[in-house]
Amino acid sequence: MNQLIIRAIEERFKKSNIPDFKPGDTVKVHVKVKEGDKERIQVFEGVVIARRGGGLRETFTVRKISFGVGVERVFPLHSPIIDKIELVRRGDVRRAKLYYLRTKKGKEAKVKEKTDYQKA
């Protein structure tokens, strides 16, 4: 009974405009940033290295290299601070968690592009 109530409440807060992306895919996450009384959109582009959780509590981790330094950011999937998520390219990987990319440098850290998929 409690599960049904929780699931019904969670359905109201879930976002519907989330693209189907997996670890290895390159995404652009448009994040709302509040500075003082102003609000603007900041784009964070990188490779999805993990997705975890489920339902309303699902999160995903995006990694990018900025000025030679690896930057990772964890985003709640259904958070109101996320304006939109754009899928840039599909990655061809065989793992669900790509934490091994943290130790790779330069071209080693590249994820191969998947060629046999249908673009939406």
Swiss-Prot record:
The keyword Ribonucleoprotein applies. InterPro entries: Ribosomal_bL19 (IPR001857), Ribosomal_bL19_CS (IPR018257), Ribosomal_bL19_sf (IPR038657), Translation_prot_SH3-like_sf (IPR008991). It comes from the Bacteria. Keywords: Ribonucleoprotein, Ribosomal protein. The keyword Kinase does not apply. SUPFAM superfamilies: Translation proteins SH3-like domain. Coiled coil: none annotated. Signal peptide: none annotated. GO terms for biological process: translation. One of its GO terms (cellular component) is cytosolic large ribosomal subunit. GO terms for molecular function: structural constituent of ribosome. PANTHER family: LARGE RIBOSOMAL SUBUNIT PROTEIN BL19M (PTHR15680:SF9), RIBOSOMAL PROTEIN L19 (PTHR15680). Belongs to the bacterial ribosomal protein bL19 family. This protein is located at the 30S-50S ribosomal subunit interface and may play a role in the structure and function of the aminoacyl-tRNA binding site. This is Large ribosomal subunit protein bL19. It comes from Thermodesulfovibrio yellowstonii (strain ATCC 51303 / DSM 11347 / YP87). The gene is rplS.
